[in-house]
UniProtKB/Swiss-Prot annotation:
GO cellular component annotations of the record: cytosolic large ribosomal subunit
Family: Belongs to the universal ribosomal protein uL22 family.
Protein name: Large ribosomal subunit protein uL22
Organism this protein belongs to: Mycolicibacterium gilvum (strain PYR-GCK)
Function: This protein binds specifically to 23S rRNA; its binding is stimulated by other ribosomal proteins, e.g. L4, L17, and L20. It is important during the early stages of 50S assembly. It makes multiple contacts with different domains of the 23S rRNA in the assembled 50S subunit and ribosome.
């Protein structure tokens, strides 16, 4: 049985945000697991309207971590982020011949938990390892071709 490592964390919640939960989840999936700085950069340039409230909540969680918990902002990572469904406001749109269609104005509750994770050790990165493997396979194929 493995135990999860507990990192110091802080959270923020935005409730009753006037954006559909499915649209918020599209944006949330872009930033899950990223550092707070990277997440805010991604959201700043994301074309979706839901990126603005999500960025606000991430910035709020980072500020909570810094002010309330005393954590270093450069080590913060978006550990958990999700959008739950809030109450739906229902409106009526009149249609032809006395009919009426229902408009559903959906809301969501956006929750973000940021954790302060230690910086990774300076080791071989995945791309460097991939480059070494490619070079080794290229050398092996050239060796086979010369024989």
């Amino acid at each position: 049985m493995t135990t999860a490592i507990q990192y110091p964390s802080a959270s923020a919640k935005a409730r009753f945000v006037r954006v559909s939960p499915t649209k918020a989840r599209r944006v949330i999936d872009l930033v899950r697991g990223k550092s707070v700085e990277d997440a805010l950069d991604i959201l700043r340039w994301a074309p979706q309207a839901a990126s603005e409230p999500v960025a606000k909540v991430i910035a709020s969680a980072a500020a909570n971590a810094q002010n309330n918990e005393g954590l270093d902002p450069s080590t913060l990572v978006v550990a958990t982020v999700f959008a739950d469904e809030g109450p739906t406001a229902k409106r009526i749109r009149p249609r032809a011949q006395g009919r009426a269609f229902r408009i559903r104005k959906r809301t969501s509750h956006i929750t973000v938990i940021v954790e302060s994770r230690p910086a990774k050790k300076q080791g071989a990165s995945a791309s460097a390892a991939r480059a070494r493997r490619a070079q080794a396979s290229k050398a092996a194929s050239q060796k086979e071709g010369s024989e």
